[in-house]
Regions:
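Cytoplasmic helix-loop-helix junction between adjacent transmembrane helices
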Residues: 102-139
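Central cavity-lining transmembrane alpha-helices of secondary-active solute carriers
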Residues: 50-64, 251-263
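Extracytoplasmic gate region of multi-pass secondary transporters
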Residues: 27-28, 205-258
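Intracellular juxtamembrane helix-capping segments at the cytosolic ends
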Residues: 112-125, 312-326
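Helix-breaking motifs and short loop linkers at transmembrane-helix boundaries and internal kinks
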Residues: 39, 71, 92-97, 294-295, ...
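Glycine-rich segments within core transmembrane alpha-helices of 12-TM secondary carriers
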Residues: 131-150, 335-348
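Helix-loop-helix hairpin linking two adjacent transmembrane segments in secondary transporters
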Residues: 136-185
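Conserved MFS/SLC helix-loop-helix module at the cytosolic interface between two early adjacent transmembrane helices
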Residues: 58-96
Length: 391
């Protein structure tokens, strides 16, 4: 009982940090509201999510190096402080420049958090239970992702200001910093010295790690793309003009993503990761295919939900396979895998350009996201159940 109590004392503040990690997914809702408020086209508005995920390319590996030197918990706390700062700016200064700064800080904070929080969780959860624990963390993260569009829409309707979401998330960030700071977590020693840039990037020369890296790029590209594009698809197909009437599409995506994470927590603890990964990618493919030619509110939301459900466990399976493949390189692997979230910059950019090229049709965005789906279908044939994980 004492051991269980000690475990829960450590796991709860870590899961609170996963909730704060979910703040990054408000970028889709914020982008669509800012696009409406500032009168931007899709290509210009997609700069905002690109600014969030650009920093994953720049800071992921340095964060892994920093984490090797100061520890995982301290790195997570720094990430939460940067995230809290990003919550302050848009509430007191609101224009295109302030949003670029806000999303940049949110991206930097989330990069620090993504790189350090997963290895911190692995300090208290071991072996084959890691994938299910990472998925549960993603479930908690998805609760924040799911609630953000609803809170923003409610704030827009009640206060005529969707930005009221920021003070709430600021408060949660501060509470998490204090709670985690007071929690003692024993971190395992890995190598005695911090990793270098060359050591981190050299891992990409390993075929298994490269496959996982590209898989995470495609996963997050689909994730961010669906987050931003779902309301636009509803507005285009259903002839809606008010964003408040279509913004719930993002919540539909994250509701199914949340459900998928919750279900995946139990399935991955008991059954084949390979089969579940394949089923997940198949759901994404079916949902994405349906968005090309189907009409009607219910069927479109079903397709969006399929993508959300399928994409909910892709990250956890790929990351856990990579970390278990090289267990003595968890910090470096985590840094490299999180660098793959740079896909959240690449996909929205090309989605915006493709949409513009097709006379502002969201079919352009779907074509770009489908490239990521095709790669994940390929990767599903390579994922293995053994600890060396990928063929």
């Amino acid at each position: 009982m004492t051991n269980n109590k000690g475990f829960y004392t450590k796991i709860v503040p870590i899961m609170m940090a996963f909730f704060c990690m979910g703040f990054v997914d408000m970028v889709g809702t914020a982008t669509n509201y800012a696009q409406k408020d500032l009168g931007l086209d899709d290509a210009t508005a997609n700069i905002f999510p690109s600014m969030v995920f650009f920093w994953f390319l720049i800071f992921s590996v340095p964060t892994g190096i920093l984490m090797s030197r100061i520890g995982r918990k301290k790195t997570v706390i720094i990430s939460l402080l940067v995230t809290a700062l990003s919550m302050i700016i848009p509430f007191i200064w609101y224009d295109k420049t302030s949003l670029i700064i806000t999303f940049s800080l949110l991206g930097i904070g989330n990069t620090l958090m993504q790189v350090s929080l997963n290895p911190l969780l692995s300090s208290i959860v071991k072996g084959d239970k890691l994938a299910s624990s990472l998925t549960f963390g993603q479930f908690v993260k998805a609760i924040a992702s799911f609630s953000a569009p609803l809170i923003a829409t409610r704030a827009s309707l009640m206060f005529d200001d969707w930005r009221m979401i920021y003070p709430l998330f600021l408060l949660i960030s501060v509470i998490t910093v204090l709670w985690l700071g007071m929690t003692r977590i024993d971190e395992q020693k890995e190598d005695g010295k911090g990793a270098t840039f060359s050591e981190c990037f050299k891992l990409l020369g390993n075929g298994v790690i490269l496959l996982c890296f590209l898989g995470i790029m495609c996963h997050v590209g689909i994730d961010v793309g669906t987050n931003v594009t779902s309301p636009r698809i509803l507005m285009e197909r259903l002839g809606l003009t008010n964003l408040d009437d279509a913004n719930y599409a993002t919540s539909v995506y994250f509701a199914f993503r949340t459900a998928g994470c919750f279900i995946g927590t139990f399935i991955l603890a008991r059954y084949s990761a390979k089969k579940f990964f394949g089923l997940s990618v198949l759901c994404i493919a079916l949902g994405m295919g349906g968005l090309y030619f189907l009409h009607g509110e219910i069927i479109l939301c079903t397709c969006i939900g399929l993508i959300g459900f399928g994409n909910s466990n892709v990250f956890s399976v790929i990351l856990s396979r990579a970390m278990l493949y090289m267990p003595n390189k968890k910090n470096e692997i985590s840094g490299l895998m999180i660098m793959g979230l740079f896909g959240g910059t690449i996909f929205p950019f090309f989605m915006g350009q493709a949409t513009k090229a097709l006379d502002n049709s969201q079919t352009g965005a779907l074509i770009v996201m489908s490239i990521g789906v095709i790669y994940l279908l390929f990767l599903a044939t390579k994922i293995k159940d053994k600890m060396n994980s990928v063929e």
